[in-house]
């Protein structure tokens, strides 16, 4: 195909595994953006222009830097058609910059920890978002079930009520390698299913359902944060 993927992901990152499958299934091309260019957003944009990149799937950090430097006022991306992002929260103010500068590009926010093999929810951004409004993580992906459970393991259905996001479906990992205690704590029997064994993954992420019935990420129940798509436990000391 004529599409070109602009890949910023390390080869061990889950986003790269998706890009690789897309590359083989669609017959498109891939441009591997060197790691050292991450500190030079202008060079990245020039590479996207030169290689006529039509699809990017990035952790938002570099996109935030591009927005803060107002680089899209100086450089256009005429070949870009699809822009997906995942791995950390994309501040809506900086996202709106991209959305307004590239009105013909389709944007999507994807969410999913590595334990469920890439992503379990998606949100195609087809409406205006206020700068102070968080970008929803949206709706379940195919073959994925999403449960929002309260502190009593009851399902949250009402709007604007917080609970822990739990995932079920075909994409779940079998557990953590050589760590049965951590596996037993995170991969548990679905408390809503009393009929047969059904494992769900407890993400530790706190979410709620807004008035549009979209899932919105609120925060963590622990001290874990994500930076550049990598997990960092703030409670750990060296």
Walk through the language-model features, giving the residues of each.
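Conserved AMP-binding/adenylation subdomain of ANL enzymes
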Residues: 1-6, 14-54
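Alpha-helix capping/helix-boundary segments
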Residues: 61-63, 90, 172
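Conserved structural elements of the adenylate-forming
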Residues: 1, 7-8, 141, 146
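AMP-dependent adenylate-forming
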Residues: 106-109, 124-238
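Short hydrophobic/charged patches on amphipathic alpha-helices used for structural packing
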Residues: 42-45, 72-74, 238
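Gly/Ser/Thr-rich phosphate-binding loop
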Residues: 20, 25-28, 53-57, 67-136, ...
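Conserved AMP-binding
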Residues: 9-13, 36, 114, 169
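Short, well-ordered beta-strand segments
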Residues: 4-6, 12, 18, 31, ...
